[in-house]
Amino acid sequence: MLALLLLAGRVPAATLVIHVQGADGRVLPGAVVTARPLEGGAHRPAPQHAVMDQVDRAFVPDLLVLPVGSAIEFPNSDAVSHQIYSFSPAKRFQLPLYRGKPYPPVLFEQAGVVTLGCNIHDEMLAYVVVTEAPYFGRTDAAGTYTGEVVRGRYRVAIWHPRLREEAADLERELTVGETDRAELTLRLSRPLLPAPLGNRPHSWDY
C-alpha cells in the first residue's frame, strides 16, 4: 500500500504536484508519473517525435515517456554495430546490425512499457513508457513531478523499472477541486528490486 497526502485545489487550471518516496522515505527520482482524468472531456496528447541514440554502448536517453502514436528514431553514434530489439507485448520489433541511421523511426501505437535491449551488448538497457494519459512526466532529483492540469478527478499512477508492486497498488485517485494547487505524496510499501550486478548507471538509479 502507498501512504498518500492530498491537498486539493479550485480553478479550471491548476498545478498538480506529485511527490514519490521509496519505502525508506527517501525521495525517488526518475519515476514515471501519469495522471488520467476519470471524467470525459480530456484532450488526447498529440504524438511526439523522439530520438534515442546509442552512445558508448548505452541508450541515450535510457527512458522515454511518450503518448500513444509517437515515433522514435534510433541512431547509432557508436563506432561499433548494434542490434536493437524488443519482445514487449506493447511493441515487438528488431533493427538488425547497423551503424549510423539506416532505419526509419519506429512507431509506438499501443500503450504499455517497452523494454529495449541489444543483441550484441547485453549490458544495454532502456525503456519506453507509452501512455494514453494527457499528463505525464518523470520525477526530478527531489522525487517530484509538477504539471498543469484542468480541474477534475484523476487517477495518478507511478512506474519505475525496479518496482515490486503490482500496477493496482501503484494507483491513487485524487480531486483537483477548489484551490489552484493539488499535492499527492506516494510512498512505496516495499523496497525496490536490487540493481543488476555490474550494471552501468541509469537515470532511474536510487
What is the meaning of each model-derived region?
Residues 13-142, 146-206:
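Extracytoplasmic copper-binding redox domains, predominantly the cupredoxin/blue-copper superfamily
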Residues 1-8:
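Bacterial N-terminal signal peptides
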